[in-house]
From Swiss-Prot:
UniProt-listed InterPro entries: UPF0325 (IPR020911)
Protein name per the record: UPF0325 protein YaeH
Pfam name, any one: DUF3461
Organism: Escherichia coli O1:K1 / APEC
Family that this chain belongs to: Belongs to the UPF0325 family.
Length: 128
């Protein structure tokens, strides 16, 4: 699993926290950030540089002109797919945790309101 990341020398892909991708001249720069350990100020990161792939395509629908375009390297595309799998998994876990906490807070308020209602009913009974 995560063969493309392992080919970059990343032995523990599960420790990846996030990544960034930017274009610089004719290259794409991929920076991968790892989870911080306790007591660390900065997350460890590694940087990779990929030359952009050049293609010649028809410039207009008539087919009389051509232009050169650059696009992301196919290898980098596969690496980004793996990074997205890792980072999306982490986001969905965070979203689930947030949902559970929200549900607990809602349940807490419902129970608190119900307890107040029951106590008010008991108070009415004891006054009679």
């Amino acid at each position: 699993m995560y063969d493309n990341l392992k080919s970059l020398g990343i032995t523990n892909p599960e420790e990846i926290d996030r990544y960034s991708l930017r274009q610089e001249a004719n290259n794409d720069i991929l920076k991968i950030y790892f989870q911080k350990d306790k007591g660390e100020f900065f997350a460890k990161s590694v940087k990779f540089k990929y030359p952009r792939q050049r293609k010649t395509v028809v410039a207009d629908g008539v087919g009389q002109g051509y232009k050169e375009v650059q696009e992301i390297s196919p290898n980098l595309r596969y690496i980004i797919d793996e990074l997205d799998q890792i980072c999306q998994r982490d986001r969905s876990e965070v979203d689930l945790k947030r949902k559970i906490l929200d549900d607990l807070r809602h349940l807490e308020s419902v129970v608190t309101n119900k307890i107040s209602e029951i106590e008010a009913d008991l108070e009415k009974l004891t006054r009679k």
